[in-house]
């Protein structure tokens, strides 16, 4: 029960509440492991279907508590959805506010670390006397380019276009040569599309999250992204703290015998491994084109394909 997890007032306690895609969950897990190694008590919130995988990556440490949230529509991670329905998951996340508030009141943590989608969490945390921390799973250079208030400085009330995104926002570090090609800018336009009952864009959610939290944390260091971190700090007028790079521990799993034998049949570094992560789903056309391109190399290859769990596979 959550009441059994409440800690003594003198023990630093944080709650982790990432978005429900594993690309977001993983950095929160790595930060949890790092904080726990320094004596911080950690409680992790997620959907029930995600918990086995989360537990397996929390250094197998039972002292890190993982609590499941109930989702009204039964959809609990992006692997269960095709990309165009990801907004449904964000809406489902919005419906957990009462659960989250009850848990925070019972657990009484000092801080709650949250993700871009939970724009409502800073206000909720403030109501119960808890500081909120926006933990960005992205690089500072990308957040500084896309999700800062000055991004709309030159738009003057009209809708933003991909042409606007091809150039950096006003005040962006001058020594940077970063810009987006047209196809890259088009990919980011989804951030400015309204969806859900709240009719908010992804950009508005991120901006509210960053603007209302107590402080911001990035998984980087000054030596790598210093000018962009300074720019973000200036834009949001609040402290930006750094965790340093967060990477998982090297795997100790033994390779399956069938793959070990297959790989042993080729010279070292001669096999191509092609994988786009656990939550990228290619169309039939993309799969055929990709496989054809790999075959044209004349090299042996392993192509890893993923499909949403609720779709028929052919």
From Swiss-Prot:
The lineage of its organism: Eukaryota, Viridiplantae, Streptophyta, Embryophyta, Tracheophyta. Expressed in young leaves, flowers, pods and pod shells. Barely detected in seeds, roots and root nodules. This is Inactive UDP-glycosyltransferase 79A6. InterPro entries: UDP-glycosyltransf_plant. GO terms for molecular function: UDP-glucosyltransferase activity. Flavonol glycosides (FGs) having rhamnose at the 6''-position of glucose or galactose that is bound to the 3-position of kaempferol are present in cv. Koganejiro, whereas FGs of cv. Kitakomachi are devoid of rhamnose. Has no flavonol 3-O-glucoside (1->6) rhamnosyltransferase activity in vitro.
